[in-house]
Amino acid sequence: MATMAAIGSLKVPSSSSNHTRRLSSSSQRKTLSFSSSSLTGEKLNPTQEIIISNLPRGNERRTPSIVSPKAVSDSQNSQTCLDPDASRSVLGIILGGGAGTRLYPLTKKRAKPAVPLGANYRLIDIPVSNCLNSNISKIYVLTQFNSASLNRHLSRAYASNMGGYKNEGFVEVLAAQQSPENPNWFQGTADAVRQYLWLFEEHNVLEFLVLAGDHLYRMDYEKFIQAHRETDADITVAALPMDEKRATAFGLMKIDDEGRIIEFAEKPKGEQLKAMKVDTTILGLDDERAKEMPFIASMGIYVVSKNVMLDLLRDQFPGANDFGSEVIPGATDLGLRVQAYLYDGYWEDIGTIEAFYNANLGITKKPVPDFSFYDRSAPIYTQPRYLPPSKMLDADVTDSVIGEGCVIKNCKIHHSVIGLRSCISEGAIIEDTLLMGADYYETDADRTLLAAKGSIPIGIGRDSHIKRAIIDKNARIGDNVKIINTDNVQEAARETDGYFIKSGIVTVIKDALIPSGTVI
């Protein structure tokens, strides 16, 4: 096994579909679940249920229900009552993503979900840990680009995951493949799932939980799934309020007073963006925050009923490649019940160098970090490495996170994240920097041989100064190197010299060598 907000009143219908539906036998009320760092909906009296099969949509009588907000935290009100429970009835599908061009050069030698995070972890650990903490033990990870390190990490971190119902849990990697029926690689998120539907449909589950492998957040998926079932949804989309600056990068939606999605636009711009503005006070935001965040954005996380997924990808939209731009809007147009699940906790789409940098440095924030790895109720798991404790000799370290197995000598480190096995020499200054560390230690014999060749050992050399930078794994930074971007260059590609600059952040490539005395 691996080591280790909303206030509002929404009406929620009890509906049916062309598939088997659960209908209340009385007019008592149900609730739409909220997920928030501070507030959740109060659950009202449950009702006895009966099963009605093949009832045509539109012929049923819908009984609206009211959310009654209650000021309690998720940790205080974490009870769910899934029947059957998630370990038996839900299959997790994590999408490994595309080539990760916006994260280049961090994705030069690895898949996007394999990019190191928070000193000890990798991005893929976030959705996998969320699944395991939510009692979802059957998990597939779909990969395509540079997947060797991702496959290695998953096999080492989660190979012994045999939890769940009858100890049938697993975390398995599914690589893109060609076949006589489909000679193409994955063309998008929906196409990736479609190509493995033959495998997914063999599992006796009720829902597919579709997740992205490059998001940073903590979510109880059991509440998400419970909301899907209680609202009798065909598809449920996790959503959150969004400001105008970032809205163009996401799918945006409009919802009615029942929480049902009535309009969906993928990454709109110009007039189309303006048309997607809504009054987000319906999500429970106060007037001031609603003005700052006038959009409802999709998180790219979906719960889809199994029979609905099979029908949509095979019959309704056999040529659709993407969930956000094709399948979700298409399902809405078909009249399927597509619900929004409102989430107001911390969430970051780590799709760019700047977003990745800010997310990592955010864990050093005082007094409360943007994202905490210290939540014992929902830990983040990763590969057990059995490294020794980090050793700091006369070092001055402030507002920083230090990973396992580091050797830090007589240097200054401020507001930085230092990855595992990092070696930092005397006199170095590290500020506002993400240092990813190393995959291995070099022996004294290795260092002697490198010195004889005039080369540089892995780590940060003497008297070097690094500020606002990302130093990828196994980088060799010589003595008296200055990576401080004194000219405030915003964009530069110097791959032959071992680095890129994006959004003013210097990124040193994995395995790069920066000679002594270099100034960047």
Swiss-Prot record:
- What pathway or pathways are given for this protein in its record? Glycan biosynthesis; starch biosynthesis
| GO MF entries | ATP binding; glucose-1-phosphate adenylyltransferase activity
SUPFAM superfamilies, per the entry: Nucleotide-diphospho-sugar transferases (SSF53448), Trimeric LpxA-like enzymes (SSF51161)
Q: Where is the composition biased (Low complexity)?
A: 14-27
One GO cellular component term: chloroplast
One Pfam family in the UniProt entry: LbH_GLGC
Listed Polar residues bias regions: 28-51
Q: Which PROSITE patterns match?
A: ADP_GLC_PYROPHOSPH_1, ADP_GLC_PYROPHOSPH_2, ADP_GLC_PYROPHOSPH_3
GO biological process: what's one of them? Answer: starch biosynthetic process
Transmembrane annotation, as ranges: none
Substrates-to-products reaction catalysed: alpha-D-glucose 1-phosphate + ATP + H(+) = ADP-alpha-D-glucose + diphosphate
Q: What UniProt keywords apply to this chain's record, in alphabetical order?
A: Allosteric enzyme, ATP-binding, Chloroplast, Nucleotide-binding, Nucleotidyltransferase, Plastid, Starch biosynthesis, Transferase, Transit peptide
Instruction: Identify the NCBIfam families for this entry.
Output: glgC, PRK02862.1
Homology family: Belongs to the bacterial/plant glucose-1-phosphate adenylyltransferase family.
Query: What is the official name of this protein in its record?
Result: Glucose-1-phosphate adenylyltransferase small subunit, chloroplastic
Which species?
Brassica napus (Rape)
- Lineage of origin: Eukaryota, Viridiplantae, Streptophyta, Embryophyta, Tracheophyta
Q: Which gene encodes it?
A: AGPS1
